[in-house]
Amino acid sequence: MGLARTLAVTLTGLAGHIVDVEAHSVQGLPGFTLVGLPDTAVRESRERVRAALSTCGVTWGEQRLTVNLSPADLRKTGTGLDLALALAVLGARGRLGRSAAGLLGRTVYIGELGLDGSVHSVRGVLPSVQAAVAAGVEEIVVAQEAAAEAELVPGARVTAVRHVGQLVERYGGRLSAAVAAAVEQITEAGADDAPTTPTRDAELPDLADVVGQSEARQALEVAAAGGHHLMMVGPPGTGKTMLAERLPSILPPLEQTDAVTVTSLHSVAGIFDPAHGLITRPPLRAPHHTATRAAVVGGGSGLPRPGDVSLAHRGMLFLDEAPEFSAGVLDCLRQPLESGMVTIDRVGGRASYPAAFQLVLAANPCPCGKAGGRGLECTCTSLQRRRYFSRLSGPLLDRVDITVEVGAVSAADLASAGSGESSAAVAQRVRRARRAAERRLAGTPWRLNAEVSGSYLRGPDGGLSAPLSRRLMTALERGDLSLRGVDRVLRLAWTLADLEDVDTLALTHIGTALALRTSGVRP
């Protein structure tokens, strides 16, 4: 009889849970039983482990194996438990040295096994290693291709392997000469690959490329400085998409905590490239208007994966041709816009992901796109226009802080092309405004004006004088603003004050904020 224990990690959202992998081997009818709420991928690991260990010369014989994944009431997902299962089986079968027992129980193993015993990377290595370090685990063993990602976690003691046979030899086990030669061949073949080193991101498009559109450029700057949601309405070809794609170029780099969270989300989604290192730039996600709810919000079979709203965390979600998106997809944005989180329930479990993104919408003024265009006559009826914008519900639009009209470019604008400010110059003002907001909001849970609660803004610490309050109440009574709209105007006003580097609100700030909020182009 043999008993061995190793450690693994399973993920629920971004939260990693340490899993005890206990293997028990006794004489009897050959069998391999896996218990402890494994999902399909984990159940299939029995065959991968069996094949991988057979390449190391481990035969089952007349042994009955039982592997328990503890805690038993936590659903285990993914193929990342393969390596821990294999080491537990080897320990239970007595194929490792005597000193291995203590090491196995203090080490987390993260990796998928190939049928030849090779070790491959899996999704979610970064948050898994974070969970292991937080639990005080001494060592984390990962696939060689995941080493760069695992080493992004401070304090992680990472060991990288290419073949399970390397661990057999490390823990005092013996391999036949033929197996040892095969392991060495696989290891050397992988060593010939170029090492993964961080590469520079491609240069972001510059705001200086935009011709004209001074009002839209100002709206973009205000949105960047305060983290406000933005909607641009205008005929085709006026530069709406061009402006939106340049918003990331004027946003400050991510703080360390946010960079780790964003990188973890991309790792869980399986789209993180370790060659680029930690993601330090605000991400940009621009789903097509045919995208489904699962693609935008998150979902999938089994445990849900993050969608575009989470992959845009601390960055920007750009919906071009916004009225073309399905109403269901657009309405699903309301919860994350308000809370900065998205919770997805499935039969296989529940997952919560951060989703504090900046929403940017772009739309034509009508289905034909000619309304507002110079020298163009709109052919749409009023009913067609209403239907076109009907998917953009009132509650969603009420959460958009800024609405700006992007008009047709004139010949004079084209003649002065290239004279606009660069992204670097605008980004400098944005950083200065954000620092001013951070100083003012010191001691509060908020960093950006767009995050500040309405009760705080309207309270004694919000800096709202009686004349400013009367101006807002007048707009509220006229029906120009909802109560949520009042709060959003105040957030915009403080951003305008921060851009001017002043400590108090003035009527001019409220007036400009009202103009940005209640533009006549709002559908």
Question: Positions of the model-derived regions?
Answer:
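Walker B catalytic acidic pair
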Residues: R314, D320-E321, C332
